[in-house]
From Swiss-Prot:
Stored PANTHER family: SODIUM_POTASSIUM-TRANSPORTING ATPASE SUBUNIT BETA-1-INTERACTING PROTEIN 1 (PTHR13084:SF4), T-CELL LYMPHOMA BREAKPOINT-ASSOCIATED TARGET 1-RELATED (PTHR13084)
Spans through the membrane: 2-22, 35-55, 62-82, 147-167
Protein name: Sodium/potassium-transporting ATPase subunit beta-1-interacting protein 1
Keywords: Cell membrane, Glycoprotein, Membrane, Transmembrane, Transmembrane helix
Pfam families (UniProt xref): NKAIN
């Protein structure tokens, strides 16, 4: 019963991770944040693998899922430090989130709750084919929204890691022993028995 509860809980956690990752992917696409987009895609694939491993009780898939969650926690910790400008990290350095291919920032920078965007015409600071804007009146600055989003990812990943380790501990080591159809699919191959050779006897005919 406890094993079933653990599997069901892990499936729920994976579903929450998928919802959070897809929501984050949408906003990262709108903000042209290519590095987070790539990371989110890998995370979605890993979570799907985790769901598959949980439903079919495949310990190898659960271990891969747990290993990815460690990487995912590290990535989101970096995002938190990046937006809070911890240490030498700066939001104005090299545009890390866009692979230095554009000047776009987080979508929440201009579209946060209560934000008022005002364009600055003919600004000498504007690069070619770009314009300068000022953002004011935000109820919550965009960097804190990104930090909260990453913190949620870390929170779900920690729970997912614990339950993945728990479920994989009680998973069968031999993956071939798993029966998808609850016993109906098991098939033991038996080679056909050799048919005894017929004894040939001469046939005599009378003329």
């Amino acid at each position: 019963m406890g094993r079933c509860d653990g599997r069901c809980t892990l499936v729920v956690i994976c579903c929450l991770q998928l919802v959070a990752a897809l929501q984050r992917q949408v906003f990262d696409f709108m903000g042209y944040q290519w590095a987070p987009i790539l990371a989110n895609f890998l995370h979605i694939m890993a979570v799907i693998l985790g769901v598959f491993g949980t439903v079919q009780v495949r310990s190898r898939y659960l271990i891969l899922y747990a290993v990815w969650l460690v990487v995912w926690v590290g990535w989101n910790s970096f995002i938190i430090c990046f937006y809070l400008e911890v240490g030498h990290l700066s939001q104005d350095r090299d545009f890390l989130m866009t692979f230095n291919t554009s000047l776009h920032r987080s979508w929440w920078m201009e579209n946060g709750p209560g934000c008022l965007v005002t364009p600055v015409p003919d600004s000498p600071l504007a690069p070619q084919d770009h314009h300068v804007i000022t953002v004011s009146g935000c109820l919550l600055d965009y960097q804190y929204i990104e930090v909260v989003s990453s913190a949620l990812q870390v929170f779900l990943a920690l729970f997912g890691f614990v339950y993945a380790c728990y479920v994989s501990k009680y998973s069968p080591d031999d993956e071939d022993s798993f029966d998808f159809f609850d016993g109906l699919g098991s098939y033991n191959y038996q080679p056909p028995q050799k048919i005894s050779q017929l004894q040939l006897r001469p046939l005599y005919t009378t003329g």
